[in-house]
Structures are given as structure tokens and as C-alpha cells.
Amino acid sequence: MVTVDEVRKAQRAEGPATILAIGTATPPNCVDQSTYPDYYFRITKSEHRTELKEKFQRMCDKSRIKKRYMYLTEEILKENPSMCEYMAPSLDARQDMVVVEIPKLGKEAATKAIKEWGQLKSKITHLVFCTTSGVDMPGADYQLTKLLGLRPSVKRLMMYQQGCFAGGTVLRLAKDLAENNKGARVLAVCSEITAVTFRGPSDTHLDSLVGQALFGDGAAAIIVGSDPLPDIERPLFELVSAAQTILPDSDGAIDGHLHEVGLTFHLLKDVPGLISKNIEKSLNEAFKPLDITDWNSLFWIAHPGGPAILDQVEAKLGLKPEKLEATRNILSEYGNMSSACVLLILDEVRRKSVANGHKTTGEGLEWGVLFGFGPGLTVETVVLHSVAAST
């Protein structure tokens, strides 16, 4: 007679969860940050609000963003004028867009990840789909399963309305699924489109205007599995540990609310200060088992909520400028893509590591950290272990 313990042991993988492939995608429409204020105030018929436009121009100038990608084109916005007002009922129009476009953009990223992985898509056992853009039933996970032609028996998990920390959440869940299901291959997808948050300017809600200056559209997909097949699968990073915490005294620091007017975004407290004040505690808890206290000995992937967060974290921890170079580069080239950001940064780190001739996928270093920050204030901390870089 087989015991429960024997069954449980047989169900579990032997090695750590490993990222086996990464794919990314953006909509084709690219907007230049330097000219975006002119476009934004023109399309929202707000050009007469010159003082507010000057404030927005300063926000964009200080954002350190060069360009962003957006599904919303001028033509789409002209066809949906309610989306250009600050608080006009417009949820139906927004929903009709995102329930179609979110899975499509996710498919583009997932297809690239599957191609890099090099295995048959029928070998994908689990699907995790994450988006803050819209809600539907059956969800984007179901739609992506159909679009990709995955097996009907693929085990799906749909994450809606998590926000900017959720790239870390996706990695944490993919790690648990891979390590607790022997032979599992998890496709995890983050897909974000700002059609739910775009709106006209308001003199009384400058925090909403901050979001209009920062957010962009994008998707990223990863394949995660334990015990990579030798000579068939190529590991990129090992997921060593993952944790989530709510920062103290941070209630209401970042809020998002889905209403008839779409998803409204609110910054109510000193978010950069709260994160920088508490980040070392998260680092100490994560790296104490490894006896690591030198934060400059790590490679870094941090959600780029905005330049102020990165500046204060860098100063608080005494990080060398190159530590957040990949993070700042993704912010500059794409803006804040919510949950997808950290996965694009991860892709940037491994590609630059190979291009620059580093010995490991983590910029030549062995250990790394990935941080997600978002509503709550919630922080996700993932400890990464690099592998030997291969061209």
C-alpha cells in the first residue's frame, strides 16, 4: 500500500523553480514623452487650461521617460470622446477594448516565450494570467488558452486588479506551482493596457495626472519549471525564495477603484518615502538565510514606479548607479507598465549580461533581488540565483 507521504513526495519536483524563457510585447503605437503634453491636452480638449498643462509638462519632463507604447491611438479616442473627459461614464467602451486586446497582447508575448523555450505548447501544464486592465468572465486566462491553442486541461489561474506589485506575485505563484507539481511547466503572462485609466486632466486631482504621465502598455510572459531537461531547456534564473508584505502605516498610499468612469488612480501618501524607509527590512529578511548584507553584491530588478522611488531606494541603500541601470532603462523606453515591468527588466538584465560578456545571466553576479511595489502598499520580494550565461 502506497502512503500519503510517498504520493506527496512523488508529486514534488526535486530542484528549484527556474525561469526557462521570457517573451515581451507592446502595441505598435509609440508616443514621444517630450511632445505628449501637447497631444494629451489637445485630444482631451483641455488646451485652454494652460497652467495645468505646464504642470503636466513638468511632470513628463521629470519622469525620465523617453517614450511609451499605447493601444489608444488618436483615432480610437476621437471615436470614444467620453474617455477623454475626466469623470464621464465610459466603462463600457473601455471594457469592450481591453477584454479583446489584453489577451491578444498577452498572446504576442507568450508566443515569443514559447518559441524561446523550444518545447511543444502541449507541454504547458499551468497558466497564470495577470492584468489590472479590465475584468471579464470567462477571463483573459480562458481567452489566451483559446488563442494559443493550449490543452483544455491546462490548469488556469486568473489574477485581476492587483496593480504594480503583481509581477512579483506572478513569479511567486509560478514558483510554488512548479516546485509542487513534478514536471509542471507554467506559462505566466502579465498584460497591461492603459485604456482603463486614460482620462482628461483635473485641477483637483493631480495624482491622476501623475498616472497619465507615467503609465504605458506592454506584456511579458515567462515559462517556469523545475528540473530543466538537460540539453533541451536552457535555464535563465532560479527562483530561490519569494515573500509578500504590507508596509506599516501605508493604508491608502496607492489606490485604484473601478467605477463607471473607468479605473481611477490615487496617490495619497509619500510612496517613495514609505518604500525607501522599509525596503531594507525586506532585504534583510530575504537574504539573512544566505548571509548576504552587501546590497551592491546583488543584481537588481525593481519595479520602476517612478524616478522618485528609484532615487530614494538608491540613496537609502547606498546602491551604485549601475545597480538600477536596467530598471531605469526600461522606465525610459516603456514607462510604467504595471505588473509587466519587472519581467521586461529581467529580460533586459539577461540579454545585456550576454551582450556584455558577463559570466552569469545576472550581470556576472550570483545572487539577485526582484522587487514589486503596488497598492496596499504591498511589496513582493523575490530572491533570484543566476546561471551561467550562454550565447
UniProtKB/Swiss-Prot annotation:
GO terms for molecular function: acyltransferase activity, transferring groups other than amino-acyl groups; protein homodimerization activity. Gene3D superfamilies: 3.40.47.10. InterPro entries: Chalcone/stilbene_synt_C (IPR012328), Chalcone/stilbene_synt_N (IPR001099), Chalcone/stilbene_synthase_AS (IPR018088), Polyketide_synthase_type-III (IPR011141), Thiolase-like (IPR016039). One of its GO terms (biological process) is polyketide biosynthetic process. PROSITE patterns: CHALCONE_SYNTH. The active site is at residue 164. It comes from the Eukaryota. Pfam families: Chal_sti_synt_C (PF02797), Chal_sti_synt_N (PF00195). PANTHER family: CHALCONE SYNTHASE 1, HYDROXYMETHYLGLUTARYL-COA SYNTHASE. Homodimer. Belongs to the thiolase-like superfamily. Chalcone/stilbene synthases family. This is Inactive polyketide synthase 2.
